[in-house]
């Protein structure tokens, strides 16, 4: 099967044109680990390169022979270079400004570094701006850091009409004072539709040096920690023992990177959970028995104990006592029935649970066990139990004492009948006090399978009892698989990305329009669409400021579907009726930053509030985020702007670890979160 991908190619004239070339499908029906990779490719903006005829370009500095126009001459062997000489070179930031002479619907930029084997001037941190008049530039439409190599770099962003484009080089990849560009192109969308009011907004884009296939929020800093594999663009053929990571700091906008070797663990396709002490436990994947621990307070990676069973594509979940349960994972480490095991943070050991059988939770995937035990929807619950909500039709209770056990919880069904398997769908606990879980999307088989619009509400009771399951609204607006989702402070669930037919490493049949499920109304609402494909290997996380971080996709080496970026979605609750950012309530004081389950917290705010919630810090990979869950809080008004609330007394509801505390005013506008650690 062949698909068409639009690429911008530079010819020998000054004019760059867009041509369409066939692209061989990658990954279709082929296990990931068997692929061989050649060179990095990145996903270009959806659209075409704009003709560079009649452009006028200016730059802040240029070396004689390397003038500004050398970056638009269609010759990859020439390049613009800032001035260098014996008397001190001008330091960054350096700017390159394009006047296209006419207004275009701009949605991206490509930058080819110099191709002569010299790294001088390679751009690291950067920002991209648009303007209609060349004077008013506003805030960046994209910013971040590019990987330091000679491949073409892209900044993809939401379409905006503009005549002027400016690239600002903030740093040089090797810390030198120069900037150089061999070729620069600007991309246009076929049309422009302004975002509709009341449906949230996308942007800006964060350019990354890696494809973020896995991520977590660092609870003590609020930074987004991301990683790919042993390479920034590929996972196949790994030598093991190495992982490329990046982090983005929302407070500064700075993207940094780190190569992790201390844990001797390629952490691609892992299980991820934040344990009861707040350490992020990363298990298996390319190095299928390994465990790596990330400690946010010290910003350090720590080697953990090997698992009893080698695993990849397994899920894991933190339990009521702070331990971590994992099961399945036949993508790597051998294909056989991989029963449960438990990690103890106190003893730093894994213990097998031979009677916590994986067989009851298997799907009927046409690729067999290699796929059927992947990405379980796991929820730590009361009394050390773990509820498995899917993706199989069968639901189960897992028990973690002694040798473990498993008991059927029935099937995921409603008055519309028994739901099929929903591999690579999502499950979100949006009200942990009431045991409410929203499940949606997915497909019967992992790949080459049509997605579903099915959505269900599962209500948990005591461990071992059959949960109540009903159909949610009329289901999703859009069938999707390989999508992602987060629970929001107000209890709604934001759903984005995915494909109508699941094909790994293909950007075909993408879903661009997100949805929000509002449980009080039992209704899904469409939101403003984005323009960057987010499918296989994409991630989403809730930020402490109430926005959504959504990025990644690809990691397939010699392909054109690698997405080295993320976007921010700002939900409508952060805007007022005029479409401007609303004034937020602020938490000015908390009586404690650490509380035992059942304990009370008193807070002070700068204004009146009406609601509050706790949301556990999230981790995400391969459609799975078992850490996030929401607790709606009952507030007591102590007078003035002082309020108190009680944390639920059951640690199966209020799992130990780090939580985000949000307060909301009568208009539903949330605060920036304060971090609360819940202990046993």
UniProtKB/Swiss-Prot annotation:
Keywords: Copper, Disulfide bond, Kelch repeat, Metal-binding, Oxidoreductase, Repeat, Secreted, Signal, Thioether bond. Changing residue 424 to A: Reduces catalytic efficiency 1.5- to 2-fold towards D-galactose and 1-methyl-alpha-D-galactopyranoside. It is found in: Secreted. Cu cation binds at residues 313, 536-537, 622. Gene3D superfamilies: Galactose oxidase/kelch, beta-propeller (2.130.10.80), Galactose-binding domain-like (2.60.120.260), Immunoglobulins (2.60.40.10). InterPro entries: FA58C (IPR000421), Gal_Oxase/kelch_b-propeller (IPR011043), Gal_Oxidase_central_sf (IPR037293), Galactose-bd-like_sf (IPR008979), GO-like_E_set (IPR015202), Ig-like_fold (IPR013783), Ig_E-set (IPR014756), Kelch_1 (IPR006652). Binds 1 Cu(2+) ion per subunit. Catalyzes the sterospecific oxidation of primary alcohols to the corresponding aldehydes. The biologically relevant substrate of the enzyme is not known as the enzyme exhibits broad substrate specificity from small alcohols through sugars to oligo- and polysaccharides. This is Galactose oxidase. The gene is GAOA.
């Amino acid at each position: 099967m062949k698909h068409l991908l639009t690429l911008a190619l530079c010819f020998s004239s000054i004019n760059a044109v867009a041509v369409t070339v066939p692209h061989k499908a990658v990954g279709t029906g082929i296990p990931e680990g068997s692929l061989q990779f050649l060179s990095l490719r990145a996903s270009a903006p959806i659209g075409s390169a704009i003709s560079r005829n009649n452009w006028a370009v200016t730059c802040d500095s240029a070396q004689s022979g390397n003038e500004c126009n050398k970056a638009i001459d269609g010759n990859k062997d020439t390049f613009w270079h800032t001035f260098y000489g014996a008397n001190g070179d001008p330091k960054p930031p350096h700017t390159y400004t394009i006047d296209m002479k006419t207004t275009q619907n701009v949605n991206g930029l490509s930058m080819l570094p110099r191709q002569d084997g010299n790294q001088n001037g390679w751009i690291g941190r950067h920002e991209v701006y648009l303007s209609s008049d060349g004077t008013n530039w506003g805030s960046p439409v994209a910013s971040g850091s590019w990987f330091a190599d000679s491949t073409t770099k892209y900044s993809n962003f939401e379409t905006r009409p503009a005549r002027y484009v400016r690239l600002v080089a903030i740093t040089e990849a090797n810390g030198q004072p120069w900037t150089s560009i061999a070729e620069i192109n600007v991309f246009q969308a076929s049309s422009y539709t302004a975002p509709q009011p009341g449906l949230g907004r996308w942007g800006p884009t964060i350019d990354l040096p890696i494809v973020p296939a896995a991520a977590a929020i660092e609870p003590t800093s609020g930074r987004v920690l991301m990683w790919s594999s042993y390479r920034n663009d590929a996972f196949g053929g790994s030598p093991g023992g190495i992982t490329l990571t990046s982090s983005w700091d929302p407070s500064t906008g700075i993207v940094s990177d780190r190569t992790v070797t201390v844990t001797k663990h390629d952490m691609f396709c892992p299980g991820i959970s934040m344990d009861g002490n707040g350490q992020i436990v990363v298990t298996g994947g390319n190095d299928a028995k390994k465990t790596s621990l990330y400690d946010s307070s010290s910003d350090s990676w720590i080697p953990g104990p090997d698992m009893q069973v080698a695993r990849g594509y397994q899920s894991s979940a933190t339990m009521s006592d702070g331990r971590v349960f994992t099961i399945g994972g036949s993508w790597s480490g051998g294909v056989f029935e991989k029963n449960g095991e438990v990690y103890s943070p106190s003893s730093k050991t894994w213990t097998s649970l031979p009677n916590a059988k994986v067989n009851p939770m298997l799907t009927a995937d046409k690729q067999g066990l290699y796929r059927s035990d992947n990405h379980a929807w796991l929820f730590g619950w009361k009394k050390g139990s773990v509820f498995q909500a899917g993706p199989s039709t069968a639901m189960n209770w897992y028990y973690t004492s002694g040798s473990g056990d498993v008991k059927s919880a029935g099937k995921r069904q409603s008055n519309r009948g028994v739901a099929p398997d929903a591999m690579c769908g999502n499950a979100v606990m949006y009200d942990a006090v009431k045991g409410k879980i929203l499940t949606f999307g997915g497909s019967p088989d992992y790949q080459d399978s049509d997605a579903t619009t099915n959505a269900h509400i599962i209500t948990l009771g005591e461990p071992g009892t059959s949960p109540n399951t009903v159909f949610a609204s009329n289901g999703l607006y859009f069938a999707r698989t390989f999508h992602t989702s987060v629970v929001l402070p107000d209890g709604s669930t934001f759903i984005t990305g995915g494909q109508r037919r699941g094909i790994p490493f293909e950007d075909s049949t993408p879903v661009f329009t997100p949805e929000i499920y509002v449980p009080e109304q039992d209704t899904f609402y469409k939101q403003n669409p984005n323009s960057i494909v987010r499918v296989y290997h994409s991630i989403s996380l809730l930020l402490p400021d109430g926005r959504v971080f959504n990025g990644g996709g690809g990691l397939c080496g010699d392909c054109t579907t690698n997405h080295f970026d993320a976007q921010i979605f700002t939900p409508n609750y952060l805007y007022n009726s005029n479409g401007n950012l609303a004034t937020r309530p602020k938490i000015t004081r908390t009586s404690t930053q650490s509380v035992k389950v059942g304990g009370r917290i008193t807070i002070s705010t700068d204004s009146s509030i009406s609601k509050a919630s706790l949301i556990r810090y999230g981790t995400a990979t391969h459609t799975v985020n078992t850490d996030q869950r929401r607790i709606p809080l009952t507030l007591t008004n102590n007078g003035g702007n002082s309020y108190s609330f009680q944390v639920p007394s059951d640690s199966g509801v209020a799992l130990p670890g780090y939580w985000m505390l949000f307060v909301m005013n009568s208009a539903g506008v949330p605060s920036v979160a304060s971090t609360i650690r819940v202990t046993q």
